[in-house]
Regions:
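Rossmann-like AdoMet/SAM-dependent catalytic core
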Residues: 8-10, 210-302
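Conserved beta-strand signature within the Rossmann-like core of class I S-adenosyl-L-methionine
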Residues: 168, 192-209
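A short SAM/SAH-binding and catalytic strip from SAM-dependent methyltransferases
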Residues: 159-182
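Conserved SAM/SAH-binding loop
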Residues: 146-149
Length: 302
């Protein structure tokens, strides 16, 4: 697995910002709740002062549907992790965890062993922002990996990962930043780690149409789709994290199947708009849909 799997602070903070904005919504309207997101966001007090509606309105002016897209991804993974842990899955590995807060904000069973994998400096920064009692949960282990002389496999096993136990792995918002070879290598290593037990793998990826025909990744009538696509990519490159890899559904399915995984679900914001936002009266119209990422859940075939 490549060191480039790990993102810099800007991306992790940007996702945490959207979680904070969503948390400011009325309880009966919000899709996710993250009481810790403000700890990771610069200017959190200003965002709180502005409130949910104004922040979302501003986001819609810049890139319509962007906030909802990231929140739907967060909720999709939340549901996946909760469902698997409730059904008896014993371990949860968060690859490139960044400022992920699921170990703290979701009501997961204490029997679920959680491993957060990231670079040492990222983990140190994250832990310094959390209350001490949350930074030292008994069922949670921080797995720091320095790829100059360590591997994911050895560090996970050294941290207590049990290769005989069922596991959920999540790789959220990362695939577009790393080479296709690095992604394949990561999946291969995960598959080898869990060949004696069942495993579920979540991955998000950016459609190859976003690179070839960006308008196809937006809803009908979306304003200035190509311009917005360039804005998204420019913003990421500006903070030193350019998007370099795009995939078709067939390509993702092939790389997963090569390593023993079968795709069970592949959805976009269009699917999750009706699943999450419509029931609380916040459904986006067709011309607000941003479908640049696909969210995939795959299961091992062993």
């Amino acid at each position: 697995m490549s060191e480039s799997i790990f993102r810099k602070d800007a991306t992790a903070q940007g996702v945490a910002k959207q979680r904070l904005i969503e948390t400011l919504a009325e309880p009966e309207e919000r899709i996710i709740n993250d009481p810790y997101a403000d700890r990771f966001v610069l200017g959190a007090s200003v965002i709180k002062f502005m409130g949910h509606r104004l922040n979302v309105w501003l986001a819609q002016k810049l890139v319509p549907g962007f906030h909802e897209h990231l929140i739907s991804r967060t909720r999709f993974i939340d549901d996946l992790v909760k469902k698997n842990s409730a059904s008896g899955v014993e371990q949860y590995v968060i690859l490139g965890a960044g400022y992920d807060s699921r170990a703290h904000r979701l009501e997961l069973p204490s029997s679920l062993r959680i491993f957060e994998v990231d670079q040492p400096e990222v983990q140190a920064r994250k832990r310094s922002k959390l209350p001490e009692e949350l930074s030292n949960l008994e069922n949670m282990t921080y797995v720091a990996v320095d790829f100059t002389h360590q591997t994911l496999t050895e560090q996970l096993i050294n941290a207590g990962f049990d290769q005989n136990k069922s596991t959920v792995f999540t790789l959220e918002g990362v695939s577009q930043y790393i080479t296709k070879e690095a992604l394949s290598s990561t999946i291969k290593e995960v598959a080898a780690l869990t060949q004696r037990a069942s495993s579920t793998f979540f991955i998000s990826y950016v459609s190859d149409l976003f690179d070839k025909n960006p308008e196809a990744c937006f809803g009908k009538g979306y304003p200035n789709a190509e311009k917005r696509a360039k804005l998204i990519m420019y913003g990421s490159a500006k903070v030193g994290e350019p998007w370099i890899s795009f995939y078709s559904a067939e390509e993702i399915e092939n790389v997963l199947s090569q390593h023993g995984y079968s795709v069970k679900e592949n959805v976009t914001m269009k699917d999750l708009n009706s699943r999450y936002f419509a029931p609380v009266g916040r459904a986006l119209s067709e011309n607000q849909l941003l479908q640049l990422e696909h969210f995939v859940m795959a299961e091992s075939q062993n």
